Amino acid sequence: MKPKVRITNIAIKNFKNVNFGELSFVNNRKNFKASILGLYGQNGSGKTALIDALELLKYALCAMEVPDKFADFINVDSDSAEISYSFDIRLNETIYPVVYRLTLGREIVQVDGNAELFIEEESKYKVKILNEEFHCQTRTPDGKLRMGRMIDTKSTATVFVPVSKYELLVGRGKEISTDLLVSKKLSQKTAKTFVFSKDLLNAVRSNAANQNAGDEKKTETAHYLALLEALVEFGNIELFVINTANSGLISLNTQPLVFKIRSKENEAK
């Protein structure tokens, strides 16, 4: 059965004019299939910040380069911004809670040239991904399930921590470890996600395929891989974000593409 993904909560910290804000997407009062249908508030209340946070999620899940405009979205009183996304992922009629946390930073990018005055005038900020965390239900040594840290990329010496989860997902091969370290540094350099990168996903897929059939580790690795792939599919196929720039074009009816939908009955006439 195709996995179903729903965003259940977003927490924003030091992003645009929001020092801290949290929004639950779950409707607990009435048994509706839909949750949030609209977001209302006065000017400056953070409505656009939420849309920009969803746009950032789209870039992350699709492993696309985060535009430099997000460097300007970091609060002026902070060096970084943190956004946490909570999901419910349905796999085989079972719902698994998942949390993806993204920390953004910025650095000054200097244009080519060695003239001091020229550099000061033309310098601008470039966005960079400082850290990514992926939390889901993990199994403890006594067999119980609890929310735990699956992937944390803050370490510069290793691909990610905890080491036990790294060895479960990727294995202990030195060659793949070196390749992933290079991929991680390139992802950080180009402001792309590493958790949902093709290199890491392929490494997990390869490790899962090479594990012995019937092994508990193979089943566990396949489960975590299914969670990651469900989010990737959700970001590429199901998540659509229309920001203020796009909504303006739609309102003005100035989209470059014009199309008409005709029913089969009208075509028959």
Language-model features: locations:
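Conserved P-loop NTP-binding catalytic core
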Residues: I51-D112
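Short acidic, glycine-rich loop/turn motifs
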Residues: I12-N14, Y85-E93, C136, S263-E265
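Pre-Walker A-like glycine/lysine-rich segment at the N-terminus of P-loop NTPase domains
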Residues: M1-L56
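A general secondary-structure signal for short beta-strands and their flanking turns/coil
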Residues: V5, V18, A34, S78-E82, ...
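Hydrophobic beta-strand residues in large extracellular and virion-surface proteins
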Residues: I10, L23, I83-Y85, Y100-L102, ...
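Residues that cap or initiate secondary-structure elements
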Residues: K16, R29-N31, L91-E93, I108, ...
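Electropositive, glycine-dotted interaction segments
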Residues: G105-N266
